[in-house]
Amino acid sequence: MKFKPLHDRVLIEVLDSSEKTAGGIIIPDTAQEKPQEGKVIAVGGGAKTEDGKLIPMDVKVGDKVLFGKWSGTEIKIDGKEYSIMKESDIMGISGK
């Protein structure tokens, strides 16, 4: 894949979240309030301050992250779906 996010944007592969309960009940998207989980595929170079200093990114390629269901913008690259968002939309880095 040839895609490089700019500034403080992050490209994330959204990992499948369970849409069924343990009893087999299907939960509609509108009722799922848990954050989404994804894997960081690419990161930008970081944002810049007003005086031009680079703010380094906290996430790196390979990190598993949590983010809100409605965060970012869905895009398709080479037939595969991803989400691109600002680093500030990411809630945190989950354990590996």
From Swiss-Prot:
SMART domains linked to this entry: Cpn10
One GO CC annotation: cytoplasm
CDD domains: cpn10
One term of GO molecular function: protein-folding chaperone binding
InterPro entries, alphabetized: Chaperonin_GroES (IPR020818), Chaperonin_GroES_sf (IPR037124), Chaprnonin_Cpn10_CS (IPR018369), GroES-like_sf (IPR011032)
PROSITE patterns: CHAPERONINS_CPN10
Keyword Transmembrane appears in the UniProt entry: no
GO biological process: chaperone cofactor-dependent protein refolding
Subcellular location: Cytoplasm
Highest taxon above the source species: Bacteria
Keyword terms: Chaperone, Cytoplasm
Alphabetized SUPFAM superfamilies for the sequence: GroES-like
Gene3D superfamilies: GroES chaperonin (2.30.33.40)
HAMAP family tied to this protein: CH10
PANTHER family: 10 KDA HEAT SHOCK PROTEIN, CO-CHAPERONIN GROES
UniProt family annotation: Belongs to the GroES chaperonin family.
Function field: Together with the chaperonin GroEL, plays an essential role in assisting protein folding. The GroEL-GroES system forms a nano-cage that allows encapsulation of the non-native substrate proteins and provides a physical environment optimized to promote and accelerate protein folding. GroES binds to the apical surface of the GroEL ring, thereby capping the opening of the GroEL channel.
NCBIfam families reported in the protein's UniProt record: PRK00364.1-2, PRK00364.1-5, PRK00364.2-2, PRK00364.2-4, PRK00364.2-5
SUBUNIT field: Heptamer of 7 subunits arranged in a ring. Interacts with the chaperonin GroEL.
Name used for this protein in its record: Co-chaperonin GroES
Species in which this protein is naturally found: Pelagibacter ubique (strain HTCC1062)
Species classification: Bacteria, Pseudomonadati, Pseudomonadota, Alphaproteobacteria, Candidatus Pelagibacterales
